[in-house]
């Protein structure tokens, strides 16, 4: 899942440099959502493993 976030972040950066506002905005939004989902899952896995 982190790979998808990185891929969409790279697409957003490239599209932003080239000036494609709509594509950059959509890719950046997807990258942000995937990043936060991954971050939440990471924190949950840390908390659950600490209990064992």
Swiss-Prot record:
Membrane topology: Multi-pass membrane protein
Major localization class: membrane
Protein family (similarity comment): Belongs to the UPF0391 family.
Entry keywords, A to Z: Cell membrane, Membrane, Transmembrane, Transmembrane helix
Record localization: Cell membrane
Coiled-coil region(s): none
Keyword Zinc belongs to the record: no
Name used for this protein in its record: UPF0391 membrane protein Csal_2627
Transmembrane segment boundaries: 5-25, 27-47
A Pfam entry, by short name: DUF1328
GO cellular component, one term: plasma membrane
Keyword check for Cell membrane: yes
